Amino acid sequence: MEYVYVTKENIEKEHICCAISNNSDVQVRSKKDWLSCRFEEGLVFIKSSVRGKCFIEYIPAKNAWIPIIGDTYMYIDCLWVAGSLKGHGFSSELLNMCIEDSKRKGMDGICILSSKKKMPYLADPKFLTYKGFRVSDEASNGIQLWYLSFNDFDLPKFKSCAKDCHIEESGFVLYYTSQCPFNAKYVPIIENLSKEMNIEFKAIHLDTKEKAQNAPTPITTYALFYNGEYVTNDVMNEKKFLKLVEKLK
């Protein structure tokens, strides 16, 4: 498999895997704008040359848009290989590229979000275990910080603000970033739907690194709360949201 490094110089002509439409699409534009500002902070985006979801995105943890402590670690934003491309070792190849790059840059290890059981948009814990990762911290909502250490130094951990996953607000409250392109499409859909149905809903866009690093949740790409309690990180479309509303009544 051949791989392509997406950079500030070629991002306008390269697709970004999870959103493959043209540059005028709101999801593509949102993600590309976000990426373009992250490259100077050390973000690396590597994708396969085939058209589809097969890529890894990582950044030094000190610049990651989540509330973690671990400045000498590299944080993996996303490692995604679509089902149609599984079974060929692409996940391992992409992970190894991240490991070797992190070592060259003097990092003490790499880390990524996962959970005891597979959750939407999080790394597969079985794959991480197979690759030698271990859990260094866990929040009250079950989201875990997994790490692979190159040296025996301090392990990465969640900031205290992200551990309890509780907020003092009623109704639905969504924290999200532009790291996930789907948010540019689906957050407005849920906002409009909630308004039409008189559902209490508030969306909080974490539009700076500082806001994301001090969020009340270990996952910031998409974290939905209801009456103060964490509910899900699964990106809601109209059907999913209505089903969730009915369930929580």
PLM segments and residue spans:
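Short amphipathic alpha-helix that is part of the acyltransferase structural core
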Residues: M1-R51, S160-A162, F182, I189-L193
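Conserved beta-strand in the GNAT
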Residues: R51-K62, Y75, W80
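Conserved acetyl-CoA binding element of GNAT-fold acetyltransferases
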Residues: I68-G83, V173
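Conserved acetyl-CoA-binding loop-helix of GNAT-fold acetyltransferases
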Residues: V81, G87-S102
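Conserved GNAT acetyl-CoA-binding A-motif
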Residues: S102-K117
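Conserved catalytic-core motifs of GNAT/GCN5-like acyltransferases
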Residues: L113, T129-W146, V231
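C-terminal "cap" of GNAT-fold acetyltransferases
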Residues: S140-D164
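Non-catalytic, surface beta->alpha helical segment in thiol-disulfide oxidoreductase systems
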Residues: N227-K249
